[in-house]
Amino acid sequence: MAKQVIFNEQARAALKHGVDTLALAVKTTLGPRGRNVAMGKKWGAPSVTHDGVTVAKEVELKDPFQNMGAQLLKEAASKTNDVAGDGTTTATVLAQAMIDEGLKLVAAGANPMIFKRGLDKGREALVARIKEQSITLKSRDEIRQVATISAQDPEIGELLATIMDKIGHDGVVTIEEGKGTTLEYELVEGMQFDRGYISPYFVTDSSRMEAVIDEPYILITDKKISAVNDLLPILEAVLATGKKDLVIIAEDVDGEALATLVVNKMRGTLNALAVKAPGFGDRRKAMLQDIAILTGGTVISEEVGRKLDSAKVQDLGRARRVKSDKDNTVIVEGFGDKQAIQARIRQLKQQIETTTSDYDREKLQERVAKLSGGVAVIKVGAPTEPALKERKARVEDALNATRAAVEEGIVPGGGIALLNAIPALDNVQTQFEEERMALNILRRALEEPLRQLAINAGEDGSVVVNQVRTLQREHNNPNYGFDVMTGKYVDLMQAGIIDPAKVVRTALENAVSVAGIVLTTDALITDAPEPKKNGARTPSMPEEEF
């Protein structure tokens, strides 16, 4: 297929147009005084959002060369969202500022490759300074503040702080669309998996159709149990201990084995519950091992040379309670060794860091949460469909920001962390004039988020930046900044206006990366449009008279 190619000034102008178009749409959403963006669809109501990455994903320009600029800038937002889950608008604002100023210097004859080297040197110094500013997240109040700032909704902030209090920082939080108009949440204590009882005859509470067994022995196997002879040795061993509570987690239980369990349950000889093992294939084996570690049991598997009739009481797990309905089973407070559980959690976290699959990462995080004993479901409600989608996106942003803050700590919000990082550029060693130019552009770009926050709040951006610097010197306090909600200059840390350090760092790194790519691009290649074909006209049908 034929291609079209443009070079030099023409290529840079097309890229700049695409970058500016996307940035203008995205940066209006920055901060609590940012505007919403409505996105039309071919059918149904338009989506309304305040989320930078959602806006960025919607932008596709008609001109293919300009669209390249928009797509490159979109990368800064998308990568920031993938790593930190928030800060996408900040990344876009930073990247546009660097590209805008950098293209002027490239057009004036600066060498873009040396210029990029200067940007990279500056980035390293700035990232180190941001990490120095970071303070470890300590209190519930700080978690609430981070979530409130990200979602721009105190109710969401309070809800997430409450949930984090109850499930811990490793807990899994699932966000669903609710049926009402309010925010609600459910907590699931212990390890839950999506398999219920095999037979309704195991139910102990007929009004709720639940089977609840306190302090049972737990037999864990990846085998299908059909023959009663496989089960008899372990049933006799359990009864010999003086207890009759037994939970069986197996691939399946049917035939004589199931009939024996049900009959003994109904007679009161044995208080049994049989549930299917969770997951499939290798994931099932891993989850059964998780259950074994949590309960202090052993997985009885022929893969390791163990047959079911060789199981002893010492191989069985224990838990304070096991609760099962037709769809789910929950193991509460397993009696497993705490050190073994923590070692398993560390192992899973290492796998999370190395995996490249988003699906695998999500499943591993769920397993960590289940071992940690915390799963929460947030049900987001709103009066209308567009409002529901917009609110759900804000809850997701707030959750991601909270996790990022727990991971790397917090810094002053309102663009101040970036402003305070600027002096770090004074110590960067440069060899060429273009490197010094790059550092000057970084100095200007780092002011841009604060400037844009002020503009969105109806203030003069440059005046606000100068006033913040003056007040920081007067009060000898680097945390002084501009509160866009009140229009006052305050100590942002005391006022609870804080950002996760990971979000600020990731936004800066991705902005510098994308700016470097755009500034060093000198030719653009895209598919040439196909010429319109004049198709043969379809002859009209002759009119007939009836």
Swiss-Prot record:
| EC category | isomerase
Q: Which processes are annotated in GO (biological process)?
A: protein refolding
Q: Give the domain of life.
A: Bacteria
Report residues binding ATP.
29-32, 86-90, 414, 499
Cellular location of this protein? Cytoplasm
A single Gene Ontology CC term = cytoplasm
Keywords (alphabetical) are: ATP-binding, Chaperone, Cytoplasm, Isomerase, Nucleotide-binding
Gene3D superfamilies for the chain: GroEL, GroEL-like equatorial domain, TCP-1-like chaperonin intermediate domain
Under catalytic activity, the entry for this protein gives: ATP + H2O + a folded polypeptide = ADP + phosphate + an unfolded polypeptide
Q: Does the keyword Cell membrane apply?
A: no
Q: What is its EC number?
A: 5.6.1.7
Describe the task this protein carries out.
Together with its co-chaperonin GroES, plays an essential role in assisting protein folding. The GroEL-GroES system forms a nano-cage that allows encapsulation of the non-native substrate proteins and provides a physical environment optimized to promote and accelerate protein folding.
Subunit info? Answer: Forms a cylinder of 14 subunits composed of two heptameric rings stacked back-to-back. Interacts with the co-chaperonin GroES.
Could you say which protein family the record assigns here?
Belongs to the chaperonin (HSP60) family.
**Stated name of the protein:** Chaperonin GroEL 1
Its source organism is Roseiflexus sp. (strain RS-1)
